[in-house]
Design a protein with these regions (language model features):
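Active-site loop-to-helix "anion-binding N-cap" substructures in soluble metabolic enzymes
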Residues: 1-348
Length: 348
């Protein structure tokens, strides 16, 4: 029988083995302080399952988009400290990012110990899925565990390339849970079924979106994704980000699913993220010198009303640049509305 999830592995195949766990610790950090550790906490069951069975656990993640440069503000060291608190035990951290330095750290790991590698995207080879880099990562471990659901679609070295070198490759509990949930929503969602899509790019979500939009009763769109749809409708979006290569698909979707797709009716905008003092709330049309960075209060109210009394909700991607307080309101309000809906019995 194929081994699909980490719990399918016999304890004998875990004890003493080096388990490389790809996680998603892309969390908001400012001045070394993590403002939201939800993504870290969600990986704890997988990590503890492995350590309780004597594995030597190697955690790896990205943080931000350093594009192959070492940027101190994008170091994962604060994550290792928070992880130590959550696990109640020390978590090692690889200061030395060279292959020899990393290997020396891992060779020194004892059973049930955990180490976190430095930001993988400090290496350009990670996002390039460079074969030798993939092979080097694979040489560090005996088992590959993918528990990074949010980045599993990316063809990077740590999410794709290195996995090809393992006989033992399985999903962690987080990925397994999300896949089960997606399968249920795809095959037999409870209705009314609401899909909420945010984040920066459509193309990162296109496969899931195409499947879910067919099943959904309503699709609420925010984040950077919304500006491609708004531009496709001929609405002035100022300097907001768009994906021009997705414009035709967005136009077709708006026609095909008319009445099902909801777009922001107002925005929190500014001249730039650096010039947040210029922050204003504008209606659907955004002035040329401004960029949209969050959904506005009218949109928040509208979307919350659409979330109430639903059978199932699928949410992927923030409503704005939530890492910055000035543009976090939309994401926070939607998160609270979904939490309330979940408490009332909605499948989320």
């Amino acid at each position: 029988m194929a081994k699909m999830v980490v719990s399918d592995l016999p304890d004998s195949e875990i004890e003493g083995k080096r388990a490389f766990v790809r996680v998603d610790f892309n969390v908001p950090i400012k001045d070394g302080v993590i403002s939201e550790d939800y993504r870290i906490r969600r990986t704890i069951p997988t990590i503890e399952y492995l350590t309780q069975r004597g594995a030597r656990v190697i955690l790896a993640s990205h943080l931000g988009r350093p594009r192959g440069r070492v940027i101190p503000d994008l170091s994962l060291r604060p994550v290792s400290l928070r992880l130590s608190e959550l696990l109640g035990k020390p978590v090692g951290f690889t200061e030395d990012g060279t292959r020899e330095g990393v290997k020396a750290t891992i060779d020194g790991l004892r059973e049930a110990e955990v180490v976190l590698l430095e930001n993988l995207r400090f290496h350009k080879e990670e996002t390039d899925n460079e074969p030798e880099f993939s092979k080097g990562l694979a040489s560090l471990a005996d088992i590959y565990v993918n528990d990074a659901f949010g980045t599993s679609h990316r063809k990077h070295a740590s999410t794709y390339g290195m996995a090809l070198y393992f006989d033992l490759r399985v999903a962690g509990f987080l990925v397994h849970r999300e896949l089960k949930f997606l399968t249920k929503l795809r095959d037999n969602p409870e209705h009314p079924f609401v899909v909420i899509v945010g984040g920066a790019k459509i193309k990162d979500k296109i496969s899931a979106l195409k499947n879910l939009i067919e099943k959904a009763d309503k699709v609420l769109i925010g984040g950077g994704v919304a500006y491609t749809f708004l531009k496709a409708k001929g609405i002035n979006i100022g300097g907001s980000i768009t994906e021009d290569e997705m414009m035709d698909w967005a136009k077709d979707a708006l026609l095909k699913y008319e009445g099902k797709i909801f777009l922001p009716v107002d925005h929190v905008a500014a001249e730039s993220l650096e010039k947040r003092r210029t922050r204003v709330v504008v209606d659907q049309e955004i002035p040329e010198e401004f960029k949209g960075f969050d959904i506005g209060p009218k949109t928040i109210t509208k979307y919350i009303s659409e979330i109430k009394d639903t059978g199932a909700i699928f949410w992927n991607g923030p409503m704005g640049v939530f890492e910055i307080d000035d543009f976090a309101s939309g994401t926070a309000h939607i998160a609270r509305a979904i939490a309330l809906a979940t408490w009332r019995g909605t499948t989320t």
